[in-house]
Amino acid sequence: MRIVADENIPLLDAFFAGFGEIRRLPGRSIDRAAVADADVLLVRSVTPVTREMLEGSPVRFVGTCTIGTDHLDLAYFQDAAIQWSSAPGCNARGVVDYVLGSLLTLAEIEGVDLRQRTYGVVGAGQVGGRLIAVLKALGWKVLVCDPPRQSAEGGDFVSLDEILQRCDVISLHTPLDKSGQSPTWHLLDEARLRQLRQGAWLINASRGAVVDNRALHDVMLEREDLQAVLDVWEGEPQVNVALADLCVIGTPHIAGYSLDGRQRGTAQIYQALCTFLDQPAAISLADLLPTPWLAQVSLDAATDPQWALNMLCRGVYDPRRDDADFRRSLTGDTASQRLAFDALRKHYPPRREIEGLKVHLEGESDTLTQLIRALGAVRV
């Protein structure tokens, strides 16, 4: 079996060497010629997989080690009887850690109490749903907008306009869809961006084009009260540098780049390929993940809960380092910036997740116990 794979997919050999020959390529370089003799194609979101790429090739399985599928021509896959799989939820915890770290940074800069803010989550899928659960477990007020789920389930959802009018913090977690009943391309266009309430914080860790980047730049120039955290950008790997300069935090599409999440995505595609080939999965991710450098922390029952929240979250992941690295990359000409964007992702340092962190609590505190549980950590 011949496998063509994005060279940045982790644990390629560990999971796929047993299937046959692996040819590694930069994700943006995978094209029709690269898959001309491939049976299996393994990609990330940077590789558009289209009819033009695959037609006439022997490829019968496509796996993307990401949660999104907007880079896959699923209609063609169905017509051509090509089996495919994504990795839903693989990086959800990493994105939640990113959002929490960003919120704590913003709160520190603005001098506000996160418990007093109203949060609007747009998109309640794998990532958004996880964030909603954590925010509610912390006891914070959350409004949710998800038109597809509202149509299918009913329930306690609100409109996007209500989110814009009522929420101090808006976090976007939608797929990118240019058509259908609920398109998300430029979901936040200039008109909607101008509806943001006074002092609002906008976080986008979904897809760059969910927000009209040019319009956001223009609105932020006019409204100094707004704050933005952007991990995704229209036109990646090119970035609107003028917009990045206006953001409190800017990063190169790494919100979900935890070591756990990236390797989890590879494991999910491995399991899907095993199912496609009708053979048992012989490799477990649990056997491959290294021990985290911060495996356990200790708290006293008298610890201030807000200090504990800050320590647990930013002790595991603090987005300010990624922001600093990103800003240093926004120099030189356009070509240099594009190369630097991809290099930051390719050489991203290992980062673990809060989930599973062991916390020893000396004494009893219902508030701290609830906090530990809300973050997905484990009291020991």
Curated annotation (Swiss-Prot):
Q: Which PROSITE patterns match?
A: D_2_HYDROXYACID_DH_3
Q: Secretion signal: which residues?
A: none
The record places the active site at 207, 236, 253
Q: Principal place where this protein is found?
A: cytoplasm
Q: Where does NAD(+) bind?
A: 126-127, 146, 174, 205-207, 231, 256
Which one of the record's GO molecular function terms can you name? 4-phosphoerythronate dehydrogenase activity
Q: Which GO terms describe its biological process?
A: pyridoxine biosynthetic process
Give the pathway.
Cofactor biosynthesis; pyridoxine 5'-phosphate biosynthesis; pyridoxine 5'-phosphate from D-erythrose 4-phosphate: step 2/5
What function does the entry list?
Answer: Catalyzes the oxidation of erythronate-4-phosphate to 3-hydroxy-2-oxo-4-phosphonooxybutanoate.
Name the family the entry cites: Belongs to the D-isomer specific 2-hydroxyacid dehydrogenase family. PdxB subfamily.
Matching PANTHER family: D-ISOMER SPECIFIC 2-HYDROXYACID DEHYDROGENASE CATALYTIC DOMAIN-CONTAINING PROTEIN-RELATED, D-ISOMER SPECIFIC 2-HYDROXYACID DEHYDROGENASE FAMILY PROTEIN (AFU_ORTHOLOGUE AFUA_1G13630)
Q: What name is this protein filed under?
A: Erythronate-4-phosphate dehydrogenase
Organism for this UniProt entry: Pseudomonas syringae pv. tomato (strain ATCC BAA-871 / DC3000)
Name of the gene encoding the protein in the UniProt record? pdxB
